[in-house]
Amino acid sequence: MPRIDDAALHEAALAHLARFSATEAGLRRVLSNRIRRWARAAGQAGQDPEAIAAEVARATAAAAAVAARMVRAGAVDDAAFAAARARRLRGAGRSGRATLAHLAQKGVAAELAAAALQGEEVPDEFHACLVACRRRRIGPFAAAAPGPDTRRKWLGTLARAGFGGEVARRALDTPRAEAEARLA
């Protein structure tokens, strides 16, 4: 079984970045998965476990170097990734908390994620909450006026989605025409 050389890792990184935007941590994770698959195949082919472990260690260091090289070349930009993802998630009705959690899971540093949420093209929390209401057909987008139990359930739904109580109440109390105008 051939070794995983730096050129193969570089080609794998380019192939991934040609199809997907990624953070540096995400690219390292993709390359690590490739190395792990290679190690599993090498073990099944009967290679020496110590040789496999040494090759995995070398390839992991090389993968980190490839990811760093992609950052220096501008092919990977965590700030741009965070801004684009925050804009998309907030526009789809995700709360600030949910967006920050998603970006953290993707490997974006907390300060970059917070800065991305403050971008002028990123919808604010109230707008995102209205989008969530529209998607779930609650609040101003409900078919009928809610009773107290239904309203409490809607508040719970928005709270589980990460919206604060004040924003959720304001969104639920917004008249439908105003909500539609705000989202237009």
Model-predicted segments: where are they?
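An alpha-helical, amphipathic repeat domain used for nucleic-acid recognition
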Residues: M1-A184
